[in-house]
A protein has these predicted regions:
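Secretory targeting and sorting signals
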Residues: 2-24
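N-terminal low-complexity, Pro/Thr-rich disordered segments
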Residues: 20-26, 203-206
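Conserved SGNH/GDSL esterase-like catalytic core that processes O-acyl groups on lipids
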Residues: 27-113, 140-142
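Sec-exported extracytoplasmic/periplasmic mature domains
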Residues: 38, 42, 46, 50, ...
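Conserved beta-strand segments of alpha/beta enzyme cores
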Residues: 56-58, 128, 157-159
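Residues at the C-termini of beta-strands that transition into short coil/loop
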Residues: 61-63, 133-135, 164
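Active-site segments of SGNH/GDSL-like serine hydrolases
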Residues: 98-104, 115-147
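Catalytic His-Asp segment of secreted/periplasmic serine-dependent ester chemistry enzymes
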Residues: 136-206
Length: 206
């Protein structure tokens, strides 16, 4: 079993207790802020159903989104950055934030952006953040993944969901190797669930 799959299996087991506890008090509130890569979840009913089991998920997945810097423009629309989106939700952000952003920028400034989003999310009442790694179809994405993994050492409330490792070799993508097919969107939704429950249970000890 590859390391990515092994870690995922451990997370599934570890998240069961948190899911059982949350079921007694209603769906767990979650906000998912992303760019166009995870956006397929927004229009694939099976993917939404997979992600939302036991969760009250707000999907904010926008084409051309960047982390902190001004987003690019697509078909005349410029979405708010991930930071602006997070800040805009205030105390309604939810218990868990999922971030899957970085394909429209380099790793320059990404470290500072992670820290700003972490501070905002925690100040707004989130227990923590699930941060999704990028598919390394370009060398610049490797640099961003290095930054994401290093951030987990600074922030015990940040849990890295290594989508790059887990999705390696899978036929879930379009021609660019990034954007998801319907099967890929459902796979990403299923992949994220145990990470969400793990974060909801509280930060891991050092």
């Amino acid at each position: 079993m590859r390391l990515g799959a092994a870690v995922f299996a451990v997370l599934v087991v570890a998240s069961l207790a948190a899911a059982t506890t949350a079921d007694a008090s209603g769906p767990l509130p979650v906000t998912f802020v992303g760019d166009s890569v995870p956006a397929s979840i927004s229009y694939i009913p099976a993917a939404q159903a997979q992600l939302r089991r036991g969760l009250k998920v707000r999907l904010d997945l926008r084409v051309c989104r960047r982390l902190v810097q001004p987003s690019c423009t697509y078909q005349g629309e410029t979405p708010p950055s991930a930071l602006q989106a997070v800040q805009g939700y205030g105390r309604s952000l939810g218990r868990v934030l999922i971030v899957n952003v970085g394909y429209n920028e380099s790793s320059a400034g990404y470290r500072q952006g992670v820290d700003r989003i972490m501070r905002a999310a925690l100040a707004q009442g989130a227990a923590g953040v699930v941060w999704v790694t990028l598919r390394e179809t370009r060398s610049i994405y490797h640099g961003t993944n290095v930054v994401i993994k290093a951030a987990a050492k600074r922030w015990p409330q940040l849990l890295v969901a290594d989508w790059n490792a887990f999705s390696s070799g899978k036929p879930w993508f379009g021609d660019d190797g990034l954007h998801l097919t319907a099967t890929g969107a459902t796979a990403l939704a299923a992949f994220l669930r145990p990470y969400v429950w793990k974060v909801a249970a509280g930060p891991r000890p050092h």
